[in-house]
């Protein structure tokens, strides 16, 4: 996507003024424990909910472990989606579940992941290809 390093914002440092600057938000998180959201995100969600997201595209991505936590694979992406779906943002970057091995995930809505799930533990050989395909998809969806 050609995002400069200066535009990468740590969620723990994010504020409403930063969010206002962008038309597209790429929001990433890892899934912790048994399907939990990374702690920093709870305050980040509060910041985002105070912003007008109605004219913004939001693309979600996250990391998980499809083997050890197959029943909560990348659930944190699903938590972000659930928290933001009433903000009227335009979600983009949904990914087909084909090619992923897992039992359950709240990040799957209508048969697709609501964002890009990555598994660097068990499927690291597919990460680069998945990211490239997702970036192209997001570019098309926001153009």
Name what the model sees in each region:
Residues 3-15:
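A short beta-strand-loop structural module common to alpha/beta enzyme folds
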Residues 4-7, 21-143:
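FMN-binding flavodoxin-like domain, especially the glycine-rich phosphate-binding loop
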């Amino acid at each position: 996507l050609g995002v400069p390093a200066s535009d990468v914002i740590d969620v723990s440092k994010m504020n409403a003024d930063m969010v206002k600057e962008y038309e597209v938000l790429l929001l990433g998180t890892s899934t912790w424990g048994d399907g939990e959201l990374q702690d920093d995100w709870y305050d980040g969600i509060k910041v985002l909910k105070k912003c007008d997201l109605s004219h913004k595209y939001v693309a979600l991505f996250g990391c998980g472990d499809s083997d050890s936590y197959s029943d909560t694979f990348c659930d944190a992406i699903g938590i972000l989606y659930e928290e933001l779906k009433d903000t009227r943002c335009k979600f983009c970057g949904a990914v087909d579940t084909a090619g992923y091995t897992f039992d359950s995930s709240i990040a799957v809505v209508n048969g697709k992941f609501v964002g890009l799930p990555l598994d660097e533990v068990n499927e690291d050989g597919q990460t680069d290809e998945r990211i490239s395909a997702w970036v192209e998809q997001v570019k098309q969806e926001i153009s």
